[in-house]
Amino acid sequence: PVTGAMWAWLVLAAGLAATSIAARSEWLGIIGGAALLISAGKWALFDTIAMRVAYGAATSVAPLLNWQFAAGIVVLAAMPVHVALLARRVPHAWQLGSAELAPEVLGVVAGMICSVGVLYAVSFEIDRYFASPAGQGWQDPYQAMHTAYSVWWAVFATVMMAIGFIRRRRAPRILSMIVFAGTLAKVFLVDMRNVEAVYRILSFMCLG
């Protein structure tokens, strides 16, 4: 029921967004974008975190290949797409009362929300996998899970850095450095906490 409700929210938000683009309506576009943002917030805070805390991991579905993950990815991707398409139809600054919203700024914000959301979504699926019987079959599931987190975060940061340089955008590069720093700190403090200090220092220097 929770995932079904999420898809209903997504269809409604996408309908508002599509209508705003077709009508070249600034205010309807802002409402559609807000609806997408609220839907993404519901998915991140309630559908995943709250349900995980209350009922445990939903291991009856395959990691990555499930409707909950798909809903999250779709709603996250819809936000920057909505801003980009509406910016083409309404290229000037959008009026919200006395305030002006620049499409370029909104595009960057939507892109960063989407990127962080994807990072979170895959991390959540890693948690789902290691809570399942298959994940528990590892010799040390806890260590394997944290290693998987670190690998995914490092891959994500590398991709964001590449996007930042290829497209000459500062925001992806900044996000990449933040994620890299967090990954290095996690590797040093969590993944290698049982390793002797001298090897932790050497590994940290090499990773840096």
Segment roles from a protein language model:
Residues 1-208:
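Alpha-helical transmembrane segments of multi-pass membrane proteins
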